[in-house]
Amino acid sequence: MKVMVISPKNKTLFNFRGDLIKEFISQGHEVVAIGPDKEHIEEVLALGVEFIEIPFVKDNTSILGDIKYYMELKKVIKLQKPDLIFNYTIKPVIYGSLAGYSAGVKRIYPMVTGLGRVYASKSLKAKILRTITGILYKQAFKGCNRVIFQNSDDLKQFVELGYLPEEKAVRVNGSGVNMERFNANELPNQPIFLMIARIIKEKGVFEFAEAAKMVKKEYPNARFILLGGFDKSIGAITPEELQPYISDGSIEFPGETKDVLPYLKEAQVFVLPTYYREGLPRTILEAMAMARPVITTDWPGCRDAVVDGINGFLVQPRDSINLAEKIKFMINNPEEVQRMSRNSLDLCKEKYSVDIVNKHMIEIMDLNKNRSI
């Protein structure tokens, strides 16, 4: 069977979907991957896939760009004749599903990996875009077999908005985490709090920095490490805006890295005060796999992985004072940190291992090698 994977960024093909693609291939399926450019092409091809480049405009208001993307997808789908399409994130989900259905593909399984800024913002522009996007989602989902969601909030919201019937929606536990790579190790004694994210406002970067500033006045030995790259999207934080927190010693900022493992090993607690509408943050799962307690927000996706008081804490979005309080609790209660550490690992083994998640994905798409075609 030929499986087509439609991606918004080449990097996600091996970072987030690599294990799933390998599972497709191990089940005896041919995989064609579609991405927007030739970035990271060596890593993509190393998965054992055929790669096709179809650029698209990331701007939500580029109507002509979207039409061109849809037409190119339809053209390639007609030529490739895939048996099944697996597509993820907003534009690949909408236009990949519409193009696939129009081209006669009988099995289409889009995955909603979060709702993005459009569904989190209260601006007039966001409201208009939500209306347009909703119409497109509703039309796109008509030709799909199942629609896969990564958290319960997104699934519930789309069903309540009438984008799809409840029986067509199914939830998986995020993208899963490779527990052989992210394996548990001992917690350090020093209170080291790590945040990994793109440097944008909605990820809670300022809340992390402000909380760090407050806590360090009382606990100067505590360390706060922010890991991630600067971004050019709406809501991006500039180096100049971040610099005061670095200069006064509130946070350490190593920048972006290809390997987060050494930083997770060094950290005692993982922190992600996000209010961005993503599916289920992969960084939270990686921290849990390494037996790290997590402080995150009471927010879609985050509250699926973290049980308040069990494997970490849920704080209010945009609230650096609430965040600082929970950080201080972790510093003052090392035995609770140890307990939450064990619970994080147990929860990850039970629900979020990539093997468990991928098995569920294969079952949803009915791609077991023993299936009779």
What name fits each language-model region?
Residues 322, 329, 336-351, 357-363:
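A short, well-ordered alpha-helix in the C-terminal region of glycosyltransferases
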Residues 265-279, 292:
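Acidic donor-binding loop of glycosyltransferase active sites
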Residues 307-309, 313-320, 329-335:
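Conserved acidic donor-binding segment of nucleotide-sugar-dependent glycosyltransferases
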Residues 35-39, 196, 223-237:
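Glycosyltransferase donor-sugar binding loop
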Residues 293-296, 306:
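Short hydrophobic beta-strand element within catalytic cores of glycosyltransferases
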